Amino acid sequence: MKEGEHKKYGPDRNFRRRLLLFLGGVLGGWTGMAAQSACLVESSADFQAAALQEERSFLDTLSVRLEKGDVAGAVNYGNFVLQQDSTEAGKAVKAYEIAVELGQKDAYVEAASFCKKALSYDIFFGKAHLLLARLYAAHPCWTEERALNQCTYYLVLDNLIRAKQLDVALEKESDELLALYSKKLPTRKDLFMLGYTTGDRVHIGGWIGESIIIR
């Protein structure tokens, strides 16, 4: 090539070479970003799967202890699980799930305790109120007086009302239970015979340990 031709075409070739190198770098960057994005998606999926497996694992462990009749061991393990969670929201969910497991094995005293723990972590946890209502309704007796045992249903109604106030998704179920358990309240006559009237406070003793207002 003549010197004039080199001067004429040389710079264009250099430019094309630099352009190809630049485009190669951009395409390589895009490829790297795509690979990185894929890794992030995969990592996110792995994390979610691991979290789900961990949750299922602790519930399985809890269930095994309960199947063996080791309620105390299940409670201790449940408390240990709560200590491992670093967030109040996470603790609330786990406490509720533990309460469900305990309730299914008829460990209602311990189940109620974990419901209250869930509410201590999240006062707006409607499901915990709903479960408390179910536990109280399933085990209302704490005295030999029938009318006083029926006062437990005031507590049931209070928790059902609170549950639907906090969680709209629980409204239908709560209303159905409200209609059912409102029929189990003591009559005014029965309460009057025991010296109680509307507006009086009654302490629900036994395993419950809560107070209600007669209305």
Segments and roles (model prediction):
Residues 165-215:
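Terminal, low-structured helical/coil segments at or just beyond the last alpha-helical repeat
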Residues 120, 148-170, 179:
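TPR/TPR-like (Sel1-like) alpha-helical repeat modules
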Residues 100-106, 133, 138-148, 179, ...:
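Short coil/turn linking the two alpha-helices of tandem helical-hairpin repeats
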Residues 36-41, 45, 49-60, 87-95, ...:
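Generic helix N-cap/helix-start motif at coil->alpha-helix transitions
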